[in-house]
Swiss-Prot record:
Pfam name, any one: DAGK_cat
Residues that coordinate or bind ATP: 234-236, 266, 298, 324-326, 392, 398, 589-591
Name assigned to this protein: Sphingoid long chain base kinase 4
Keyword hit for Thylakoid: no
Function according to Swiss-Prot or TrEMBL: Catalyzes the phosphorylation of the sphingoid long chain bases dihydrosphingosine (DHS or sphinganine) and phytosphingosine (PHS) to form dihydrosphingosine 1-phosphate (DHS-1P) and phytosphingosine 1-phosphate (PHS-1P) respectively. Involved in the biosynthesis of sphingolipids and ceramides. Required with LCB3 for an effective incorporation of DHS into ceramides through a phosphorylation-dephosphorylation cycle. Involved in heat-induced transient cell cycle arrest.
Membrane topology: Peripheral membrane protein
Glycyl lysine isopeptide (Lys-Gly) (interchain with G-Cter in ubiquitin) crosslink residues: 148
Binding positions for substrate per the UniProt entry: 291-294
GO molecular function: ATP binding; D-erythro-sphingosine kinase activity
Primary gene name: LCB4
């Protein structure tokens, strides 16, 4: 096959534009269906983990996907990797292109050695991009004639193949849909290289880097390439599927994007605390918890107990690959409950600092206070979370059943509550939210930014606001950041307010948190912000009739429950709660805590994590 029949492409500001001279995407009946090209373009540029549905916009099982449609743009946010192909190497039949150079290679299969208890995975390839959602299509061709070459191969512009001086033969790895997941695929392209200066025509100095490096730079613009990741897996967590979910769905994306991976499996309760406390932080820049929310809690507290905790929190980003029964961190930070899409967001996001909360109780305050990244709760929610552990195999539905049961019983949990307010009324809270919602915005933008001459579906600009540049410096934290402003050993400060005893003696729900979602479809804190220096507080009492409580609970998926007049919703800096019951518990990040006075305060910007677009998932609170 001659070179002119190979897929040819042009590097543009939006991505790699397919400009094959003689090939189009036909179905088996020889026709390019109306809407196919636009549908694929849309699905390549979006970032949701749902499936695309539109009139004529999805592919039937009979359709051939060996070729991309003419004028398809593979956006930079879809590209995972790129490398030069040496056309003289084995696989090109001594300089002749393979019989079908257009086929894509399915890279989602796991290694046969995946059941090793502790192993290291590394990939030398340079990485490239991020992504979002695709049409419902399972039968991407898994046969391949793609050339297997090492990443350091240089291009061979062989005259016999008709490759011109301004063209490079490049193997592109990018993310494509398969069912409900995203998987890496490879495609070999003959790319016409046009310099930045020539394309932009801005007069700026021309950078003489190669085409591959330019693709990588634009695909990972403002994000970290080649991450060194410690993946911690609880193989028995949730429904017991965490290991398989990571190996089959998340790992292929991480490996093909050039990440170096080591895997550690937890072997006993709270093992992740010990792993984080003892690990060599010089080997990693990211800890990815392939689990529910319990492992991130343990990792954060393990790092907190290190003698070099300042260095640990300055260097390491802690994130989640959703593989457990509760995946609030991934839903809030990566905007998805799907491990493959979360992995894609992981490699594309910029490190962002978020607030933590420090919890103190008499039984452990002289040992180590506990850090919390998600929430603390007392009352119905705590009982429903912890006391349904025996049916954890049911997944998130266990929590809903527990809440409904306790509400119907009309349980109340008397206590005393002292609060340091930041925004007491709902009106003050809304003002605070609007003033602070973009305070920490400064990370990679995945969403399209339309220009007058481009279709909004095809664009994926990676803009950054420099307001957080200093905040993300390597030495942002020092030991002072870990000192408590309100030690529990001291009396309650005078500027704290004691909540009305008529409310607290009839308390049903006491819930404080820092992330908008506490579980899938449970948007409990819609006004939560990553680093606004406050904790969200939600309270209800047992005097609310069941006829009113029912619609409140049914609106948790929308987050509109906080608008109901019976629901107290505030922003606070610290609080102390003193239970008046003899039996019960607290739940902190889903972990059982003793029933004794609990004091909590905000710890501003203590932890690095990875946020898609530099912010939490949009809860639409602004428009509520």
């Amino acid at each position: 096959m001659v070179v002119q029949k190979k897929l040819r492409a042009i590097l543009t500001d939006e991505g790699v534009l397919i400009k094959s001279q003689s090939h189009h995407m036909f179905n088996k009946h020889g026709q390019l269906r109306s809407g196919d090209s636009l549908s694929l373009l849309s699905c390549l540029s979006c970032l949701d983990d749902g499936t695309l549905s539109s009139d004529g916009g999805s592919f039937d099982e009979d359709d051939s996907l060996e070729l991309l449609p003419l004028n398809t743009t593979i956006p930079f946010n879809r590209i995972l990797n790129a490398k030069y192909v040496n056309v003289g190497q084995k696989g090109f039949n001594n300089g002749k292109i393979s019989s079908n150079p257009f086929q894509t290679e399915n890279l989602s299969s796991s290694s046969e050695n995946d059941d090793v208890e502790n192993h290291s995975l590394s990939n030398d390839k340079a990485p490239v991009s991020e992504s979002q959602s695709f049409p419902k299509k399972d039968k991407w061709d898994t046969k391949t004639n793609t050339v297997k070459v090492s990443p350091d191969d240089s291009q061979d512009n062989s005259p016999s193949l008709g490759i011109k001086d301004n063209q490079q033969l490049i193997e592109l790895t990018f993310a494509v849909p398969k069912g409900h997941d995203v998987i890496p695929q490879k495609l070999t392209l003959l790319i016409d290289h046009v310099s930045r200066k020539s394309r932009a025509n801005t007069g700026e100095e021309n950078i003489s880097s190669g085409t591959v490096e330019e693709i990588l730079e634009k695909s990972y613009e403002n994000s970290k390439r080649n991450r060194s990741i410690l993946v911690i897996i609880n193989p028995h967590g949730g429904k017991g599927t965490a290991k398989n979910l990571f190996l089959t769905k998340a790992r292929p994306i991480l490996v093909e994007s050039g990440c170096k991976i080591e895997i550690a499996y937890t072997k006993y309760a709270r093992h992740a605390i010990d792993i984080a406390k003892d690990l060599d932080i010089s080997k990693y820049d990211t800890i990815a918890c392939a689990s529910g929310d319990g492992i991130p809690y343990e990792v954060i507290n393990g790092l907190y107990r290190r003698p070099d905790r300042v260095d640990a929190f300055n260097k390491l980003a802690v994130t989640q690959l959703p593989c457990g029964s509760g995946n609030a961190m991934s839903i809030s930070c990566h905007w998805t409950n799907n491990p493959s899409y979360a992995a894609l967001c992981l490699v594309k996001s910029i490190e962002t600092r978020i607030d933590l909360m420090c919890c103190s109780q008499p039984s452990y305050m002289n040992e180590w206070p506990r850090l919390s990244f998600l929430s603390q709760t007392y009352g119905v929610i705590a009982e429903s979370d912890i006391n349904t552990e025996f049916i954890r195999w049911m997944g998130p539905v266990r929590f809903n059943l527990g809440v409904a049961f306790n509400i119907i019983q009309g349980k109340k949990y008397p206590c005393e509550v002292f609060v340091k307010y930041a925004a007491k009324s709902k009106k003050e809270l809304k003002v605070h939210f609007l003033e602070n919602k973009d305070k920490n915005k400064g990370c990679l933008t995945f969403e399209p930014n339309p220009s007058p001459n481009s279709s909004p579906d095809l664009l994926s600009k990676n803009n950054i606001n420099n307001s957080t540049k200093d905040e993300l410096s390597p030495n942002f934290l020092n030991e002072d950041n870990f000192k408590l402003k309100y030690p529990m050993t001291e009396p309650v400060p005078r500027d704290w307010e004691k909540m009305d005893s008529e409310l607290t003696d009839n308390l049903t729900i006491f819930y404080t948190g820092k992330m908008p979602y506490i579980a899938k479809d449970t948007k409990f804190f819609p006004a939560a912000l990553p680093a606004d220096g406050t904790i969200d507080l939600v309270i209800t009492d047992a005097r609310i009739p069941v006829t009113r409580m029912t619609p409140i609970l049914l609106s948790l998926d929308k987050g509109s429950h906080v608008l109901e007049p019976e629901v107290i919703h505030s922003k606070i800096l610290a609080y102390k709660i003193i239970p008046k019951v003899e039996s019960g518990l607290f739940s902190v990040d889903g972990e059982k805590f003793p029933l004794e006075p609990l004091q909590v305060e905000i710890m501003p910007m203590l932890c690095k994590t990875l946020l898609r677009n530099g912010r939490y998932i949009d809860t639409e609170f602004e428009s509520m």
